[in-house]
Amino acid sequence: MRLAMILLSIPLFVSGNVLHVPTQVTKSHAVSPDAQFVVAMGRRSLRTSGEANEERTRLNTLLLLDDVTEAEMSSIKKLALTFAKLENRNDGAADLFNMLRRQGHTKESARNAGNLYTKYLQNPSAFHT
């Protein structure tokens, strides 16, 4: 049995297929041209030059709802702490409406506050700065 294994392994050693030759392996040291240059701030750019003029915005502005106007946005930001307290108590827009009516506010102002609170509840973190 041992003789058969030796006889079978001799042609493999002679042809060179059994041994690993490290000279056949080459390493590639390719680096992106954009990653080679350091920008003015001392950071490397990981984007291609074609994407350089893409506009950037903060994440919380991307999360805002499209139907929230600037006036509503400023009103919600003014009332954000109050809305956060209501949210912690698990109060809804109807609870806010009833509370404002008991305090003597008009139906219209209480309804508007309830609508603002509903928009606040859809994404509360977008209104806290």
Swiss-Prot record:
Where the protein is mainly located, per its record? secreted
Q: What induces it?
A: Expression is induced during host plant infection.
- Give the signal peptide as a residue range, or say none if absent: 1-16
Query: Is tRNA-binding found in the keyword set?
Result: no
The GO cellular component terms are:
extracellular region; host cell cytoplasm; host cell nucleus
RxLR-dEER, short sequence motif: residues: 44-56
Indicate yes or no for the key word DNA-binding.
no
Q: Where in the cell is it found?
A: Secreted; Host cytoplasm; Host nucleus
Output the superkingdom of the source species. Eukaryota
The UniProt keyword set, sorted, is: Host cytoplasm, Host nucleus, Secreted, Signal, Virulence
Function summary? Effector that enhances P.infestans colonization of Nicotiana benthamiana leaves.
Which family does the record assign?
Belongs to the RxLR effector family.
Domain topic, free-text comment: The RxLR-dEER motif acts to carry the protein into the host cell cytoplasm through binding to cell surface phosphatidylinositol-3-phosphate.
Q: What is this protein called?
A: RxLR effector protein PexRD43
Q: Which organism is it from?
A: Phytophthora infestans (strain T30-4)
